[in-house]
């Protein structure tokens, strides 16, 4: 496991070594994929120019028509997870006064157990510095 740190928007997260990385052209994030399972982790961040709060962003999330919907909310973060066909999508967004950062994970329903393990292990390391 190593830690991805974004210098443009101060956030970081631990990533398994087997995941291959693609930096985004803008430098605001990175995309990682496990070549064996197709598990994808997209990390991206941007400046909180509108002084939004996590709660304001959470209530604006469009959850209509999403199957197996799961949501959670904390003081400065929220999670939305759902299924699209045979893909599970899990998004955690952290909001601070200066930065909004999102970890977007996608994995096959066939890899549900592995996905849950990765979420339980890695998402606690996702933070805005």
Write out the residue ranges for each language-model feature.
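Extracytoplasmic/secreted proteins, especially bacterial periplasmic and envelope-associated proteins
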Residues: 14, 56, 117-121
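Surface-exposed amphipathic alpha-helical segments
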Residues: 19, 100-129
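Second-shell loop/turn segments in exported
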Residues: 3-5, 41-48, 105-113
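Secretory pathway targeting signatures of secreted, lumenal, and periplasmic proteins
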Residues: 7-55, 83-86
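Short secondary-structure junctions
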Residues: 18-25, 60-73, 127-129
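Short, hydrophobic/aromatic-rich segments at coil-to-beta transitions
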Residues: 1-3, 26-29, 72-81
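Intrinsically disordered, low-complexity Ser/Thr/Pro-rich tracts
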Residues: 1-5, 124-127
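Signature of long, low-cysteine stretches enriched in small and polar/charged residues
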Residues: 57-114
């Amino acid at each position: 496991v190593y830690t991805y740190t974004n210098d443009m928007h101060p956030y970081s997260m631990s990533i398994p070594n087997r995941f291959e990385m693609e930096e985004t052209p803008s430098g605001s994030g990175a995309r990682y994929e496990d070549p064996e399972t197709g598990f994808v982790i997209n990390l991206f961040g941007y400046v909180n120019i509108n002084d939004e709060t996590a709660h304001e962003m959470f209530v604006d999330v469009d959850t209509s028509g999403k199957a197996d919907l799961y949501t959670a909310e904390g003081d400065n973060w929220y999670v939305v997870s759902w299924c699209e066909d045979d893909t599970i999508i899990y998004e955690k967004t952290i909001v601070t006064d200066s930065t909004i950062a999102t970890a977007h994970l996608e994995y096959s329903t066939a890899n549900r157990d592995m996905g849950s393990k990765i979420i339980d292990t890695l998402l606690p390391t996702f933070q805005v510095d």
